[in-house]
Amino acid sequence: MTGSINNEKEVVMNTRITTRKWDDFHAHLRQEELLRIAVPHTAAYFERALVMPNIKPPVCDMLVAKRYRNEILDVAHRSGYPDFEPLMTIKIVDGMNSGTVSLAHAFGMVAGKAYPVGATTNSEEGVSDFRHPRLRRVFEEMEAGGMVLSVHGEMPLAPSLEREARFLCELEWLATQFPKLKIVMEHITTRKAVEAVCSLPSTVAATITVHHLFLTLDDVIGGKLNPHHFCKPIAKTLDDRAAVQEAAISGNPKFFFGSDSAPHRRENKECGAGEAGIFTSPVAPSLLAEFFESRESLHRLESFVSRFGAEFYGLPLNKGTITLIKEPWEVPRIYSSFIVPFKAGETLQWKVVERS
């Protein structure tokens, strides 16, 4: 028996799942050699992906955006995924003018991504003050045009475990000042963030990653240091993880999937100053199925990965289906000789077998 894409409650059997094709509303596709690896792994499982703009140089204008999009599409086509659609974003930075955002929207960019300066990889150019008058005009333009504001919600100067919670006052300010602006709090990791998103109007939503459904801080530093579990925002407490897990399976349309899959070369992870980011795209479908099954919530998986995000962004739902079966497989210990994936060497219980 196969689950239906028309009635989520029909996805009840535990050996085969068929759902509408999936979206990833937070993906790092990188550049050059890493891009040639990241794109096929994302396109293999996701019909669309919201592409993060924190490359070098950052996607801050149409020339860079067009070139980057063409590079992604070229790799996707050559890898056998001609239908893959990269949803492009523009990086919001100090000093940006509203005209740039207007052009970005006209070009087809669906979101502007705001990183607090220094918050994560390649965020040296970002936002130092969300309340600056010049950025107010940018946010007003986004609000008027229906463009989504995607935010990395951390305050970089706060202690690591408090950065997300400290940012929530900025999230609340943005939601109050720009009541029609759609805002996504990316990759939430704390109970306080879940509660804040729930308390704010329907214009505010959040993405949840697969790795934050599995990790706590102990998985990063509790025994031996595991650099392949290091990401930003860093994994938090058991209580925080429980809140994020409950949000993912709640059926609340404010919460949807964004992988934040972020590949780095092995030598840049296993070193004295390792990069933040976890490469999850090869295992995300398997782990999501495993997690939702463990919580007796497979009937809500499709909405989390295929419906809620698309509806929030005002996009049509994907056509076609993706099928997973319950069949053990071992995650490779390394991809392309230099990228270590999440759950490397472990045996997972679900695997993708068909896309149509």
Each language-model region and where it sits:
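His/Asp/Glu-enriched, well-ordered alpha-helical/loop segment
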Residues: 250-317
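Active-site neighborhoods of metal-dependent hydrolases
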Residues: 208-275, 322-356
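Short helix-capping segments at alpha-helix termini
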Residues: 74-83, 176-180, 201-202, 296-297
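Divalent metal-dependent hydrolysis catalytic cores, especially in the metallo-beta-lactamase
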Residues: 24-25, 38-63, 81-93, 109-122, ...
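Histidine/acidic residue-rich metal-binding segments in metalloenzymes
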Residues: 96-114, 122-257
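Short, electropositive alpha-helical surface patch
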Residues: 86, 161-180, 198-208, 262-282, ...
